[in-house]
């Protein structure tokens, strides 16, 4: 298997990729990168989860480093995908002075115009808003040498086929290298290829991650204010060897990590603002079992190749199928079984159905565990830990205290009291998570009115700075090296139980 350096990627970019956890190129990256560096047009038929963003993004960074002005334009069907692609490009280009700007509908155009005036090398946008900027001449095409169409079939389904033609016609074929990626190749896309591309190199690859039968996929319906309680109950009952937890934003990752630490879990967070040195430190801890919970954003976790991840928890539901693919693909590797659980607000069920329709299979509904299940799991865990502690030599002063207590109390009552304290430790620790509204309902008809609308579909609600306190009061002076055990047990959702899951 060729590595990135052998494919022609610079040492600086290879160093960045290694820090991100990318050790070897995926098949589509291995096939596409050499053609991209040679300047050839590429027609990539790739399903989600195959690494296609890296297939065009990694060599693109090599082509724009040291250049000024807009060098590359990337079209995406939705604002969410545009933002995701842009964030990953920023990750690929860390420390290389590459500027990436996003343009899409639903955001003030004046702010985007100011960003374009700063001369970014790469622009990522939705078709409608890109055309707005072309018509205003705030996006100039004279320096663009690379045009990339990501998820072209999805743009076609949303009614953007004419917009795609308009944009491709604005950038003369003789000056541009064109890369088009699509999961399917309907006739309209084939016509587009014949009309606007120059003898493209055809690269096909399939999605290995999503076809992996070793991953059991579940969703659980839960309200935002009950999500953290439910999540920690899952951790208590599942007792994952290694778990990756996905949050939608950097703020969410930071707050989740802090909340888990306050509850006694061994957790660290990863997102785009984490330095490379810190990222490497966190990944080393995770691989060496110094921490067992990694909280991450989608982009920060892409490319991670860590064996032994038994569980993936989507604390925030992913906004598209590709993100879901990458998330759950972190588990169920090397022939091992994995479990993926997605938390979903009742009004977000359209997103679950979209993922199911895209992947051709249904997720199973999973009921949050009852109080008795949680307590039983905690008790079993404490029993195992006590047995392990008994193998260690106790300090003399602790033995003296033990003797004094045994003279005053019955041994059975004394041990029971200590065990109860361990089982219920941290139950009253206060946590704070910023309240985030659920995603907007989807229009599942799959057809947009397209032209000039520029990605207004599937917009997220704006985050509100509401604060949500956990249902606990801080208990001072109580510490334990044990994971936090906390539960409210109010859910009555029907579905599979944990006993069913473990059969």
From Swiss-Prot:
Keywords for this protein: ATP-binding, Cytoplasm, Helicase, Hydrolase, Nucleotide-binding, RNA-binding, Stress response
Top-level enzyme category: hydrolase
EC number annotated for this UniProt entry: 3.6.4.13
Sites where the protein binds ATP: 46-53
Motif Q motif per UniProt: ranges: 2-30
Compartments where found: Cytoplasm
Chain intervals with Basic residues compositional bias: 466-480
Catalytic activity: ATP + H2O = ADP + phosphate + H(+)
Domain Helicase C-terminal positions: 214-375
Source superkingdom: Bacteria
Function: DEAD-box RNA helicase possibly involved in RNA degradation. Unwinds dsRNA in both 5'- and 3'-directions, has RNA-dependent ATPase activity.
Protein name, as recorded: DEAD-box ATP-dependent RNA helicase CshA
Species annotation: Staphylococcus haemolyticus (strain JCSC1435)
């Amino acid at each position: 298997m060729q590595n990135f350096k052998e494919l022609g990627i610079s040492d600086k970019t290879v160093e960045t990729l290694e820090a991100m956890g990318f050790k070897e190129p995926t098949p589509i990256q291995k096939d596409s990168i050499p053609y991209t560096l040679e300047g050839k047009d590429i027609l990539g038929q790739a399903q989600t989860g195959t690494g296609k963003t890296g297939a065009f993004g990694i060599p693109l960074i090599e082509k724009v480093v040291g250049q000024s002005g807009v060098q590359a334009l990337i079209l995406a069907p939705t604002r969410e995908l545009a933002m995701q692609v842009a964030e990953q490009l920023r990750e690929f280009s860390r420390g290389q002075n590459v500027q990436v700007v996003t343009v899409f509908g639903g955001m003030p155009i004046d702010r985007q115009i100011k960003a374009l005036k700063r001369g970014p090398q790469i622009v990522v946008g939705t078709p409608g808003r890109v055309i707005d900027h072309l018509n205003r001449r705030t996006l100039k095409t004279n320096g663009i040498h690379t045009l990339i169409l990501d998820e072209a079939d999805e743009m076609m389904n949303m009614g953007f086929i004419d917009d795609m033609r308009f944009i491709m016609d604005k950038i003369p074929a003789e000056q541009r290298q064109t890369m088009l990626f699509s999961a399917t190749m309907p006739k309209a896309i084939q016509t587009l290829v014949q009309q606007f591309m120059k003898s493209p190199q055809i690269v096909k690859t399939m999605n290995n991650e999503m076809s992996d039968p070793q991953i059991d996929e579940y969703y659980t319906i839960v309200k935002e204010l009950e999500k953290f309680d439910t999540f920690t109950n899952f951790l208590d009952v599942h007792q994952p060897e290694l778990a990756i937890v996905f949050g939608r934003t950097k703020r969410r990752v930071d707050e989740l990590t802090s909340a888990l630490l306050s509850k006694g879990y061994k957790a660290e967070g990863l997102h785009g603002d984490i330095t490379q040195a810190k990222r490497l430190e966190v990944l080393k801890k995770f691989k060496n079992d110094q921490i067992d919970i990694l909280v991450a954003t989608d982009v920060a976790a892409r490319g991670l190749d860590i064996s032994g991840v038994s569980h993936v928890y989507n604390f925030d539901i992913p906004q598209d199928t590709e993100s879901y693919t990458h998330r759950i693909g972190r588990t169920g590797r090397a022939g091992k079984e994995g479990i993926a659980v997605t938390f979903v607000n009742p009004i977000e069920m359209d997103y679950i159905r979209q993922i199911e329709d895209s992947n051709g299979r249904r997720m199973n509904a999973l009921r949050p565990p009852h109080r008795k299940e949680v307590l039983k799991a905690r008790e079993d865990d404490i029993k195992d830990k006590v047995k392990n502690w008994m193998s260690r030599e106790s300090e003399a002063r602790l033995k003296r205290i033990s003797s004094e207590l045994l003279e005053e109390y019955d041994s059975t009552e004394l041990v029971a009291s200590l065990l109860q304290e361990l089982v219920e430790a941290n139950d009253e620790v206060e946590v704070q998570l910023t309240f985030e509204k659920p995603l907007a309902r989807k229009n599942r008809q799959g057809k947009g009115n397209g032209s000039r609308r520029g990605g207004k579909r599937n917009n997220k609600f704006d985050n509100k700075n509401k604060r949500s306190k956990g249902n606990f009061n801080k208990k001072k002076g109580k510490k334990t090296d044990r994971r936090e055990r906390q539960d409210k047990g109010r859910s009555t959702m029907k579905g599979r139980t944990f006993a069913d899951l473990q059969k």
